[in-house]
Amino acid sequence: MSIKVIVAGFKGRMGSTAVEMVKGDDELTLAALLDPFAAEKEVDGVPVFTDKADLVGFDADVWVDFTIPAVAYENTRFALENGFAPVVGTTGFTEAQIQKLTDLSKDKSIGGLIAPNFAIGAILLMKFAAEASKYFPDLEIIELHHDKKKDAPSGTAVKTAELIREVRESKRQGAEDEMETLAGARGAEFDGFRIHSVRLPGLVAHQEVIFGAQGEGLTLRHDSYDRISFMSGVNLGIKEVVKRDQLVYGLEHLL
């Protein structure tokens, strides 16, 4: 039976790409579109909504969310409360918010996914970086995105850092008497290492994890050159969350 999908944020770049992915899969049905800036009432016969409250009682299985950090938490909570399994690519969630949504999903016995990155290569980078940090504990993360991205550092960088923290012995890097002559020059501090954010036009989504040791170095890098790179992960998420009864944070839990 076809999985009925709502796409929230369909006017955006990621949302519009997700719409095309859903339309191109015979196992999925595009049930509704949501965006507060939409002027049209329907697109190719699919109803368009500007207020999520109008979707209460709507017949759908999955809520795909590519909106903005300011509304993503409320959208995800709304989806769970109304029986839609959320697949969320919007970043900016706090640990407390993720825990609240996980608890709500358990109460409702509804599956869900919040993923900082849907590209399979990016997930592999996270795993490889965590493994490497056991042997190269001195490291820095550099993430690079388009200049319209609102949050920094990226959710992918934060998730990578969290996975590294789980296995790396905590240590403070750099000189003890290190001094920034320009505030922020060393980037954001996380568990003793640094995260740097680059925002430039022409970029999509890129990340490096640079490791240093005596006499050697190791660099891991992933590049998304086009948003289509995320769609295999979104597709997987849609098809997996309907089988589950709890929300998870990170696509790696579904691989």
Curated annotation (Swiss-Prot):
Domain of life: Bacteria
PROSITE patterns from the UniProt entry: DAPB
Enzyme active site: 145, 149
SUPFAM superfamilies: Glyceraldehyde-3-phosphate dehydrogenase-like, C-terminal domain (SSF55347), NAD(P)-binding Rossmann-fold domains (SSF51735)
Record's subcellular location: Cytoplasm
GO MF term set: 4-hydroxy-tetrahydrodipicolinate reductase; NAD binding; NADP binding; oxidoreductase activity, acting on CH or CH2 groups, NAD or NADP as acceptor
Reactions the enzyme catalyzes: (S)-2,3,4,5-tetrahydrodipicolinate + NAD(+) + H2O = (2S,4S)-4-hydroxy-2,3,4,5-tetrahydrodipicolinate + NADH + H(+); (S)-2,3,4,5-tetrahydrodipicolinate + NADP(+) + H2O = (2S,4S)-4-hydroxy-2,3,4,5-tetrahydrodipicolinate + NADPH + H(+)
Enzyme class (EC, first level): oxidoreductase
Annotated (S)-2,3,4,5-tetrahydrodipicolinate binding sites: 146, 155-156
Keywords carried by this UniProt record: Amino-acid biosynthesis, Cytoplasm, Diaminopimelate biosynthesis, Lysine biosynthesis, NAD, NADP, Oxidoreductase
Function summary: Catalyzes the conversion of 4-hydroxy-tetrahydrodipicolinate (HTPA) to tetrahydrodipicolinate.
Organism whose genome encodes this protein: Streptococcus thermophilus (strain ATCC BAA-250 / LMG 18311)
Record-level GO BP terms: diaminopimelate biosynthetic process; lysine biosynthetic process via diaminopimelate
Matches recorded under InterPro entries: DapB_C (IPR022663), DapB_N (IPR000846), DapB_N_CS (IPR022664), DHDPR_bac (IPR023940), NAD(P)-bd_dom_sf (IPR036291)
Gene3D superfamilies: Dihydrodipicolinate Reductase, domain 2 (3.30.360.10), NAD(P)-binding Rossmann-like Domain (3.40.50.720)
Name of the protein: 4-hydroxy-tetrahydrodipicolinate reductase
Protein residues bound to NAD(+): 9-14, 89-91, 115-118
EC number: 1.17.1.8
Listed pathway(s): Amino-acid biosynthesis; L-lysine biosynthesis via DAP pathway; (S)-tetrahydrodipicolinate from L-aspartate: step 4/4
GO cellular component: cytosol
Family from the record: Belongs to the DapB family.
Gene that encodes the chain: dapB
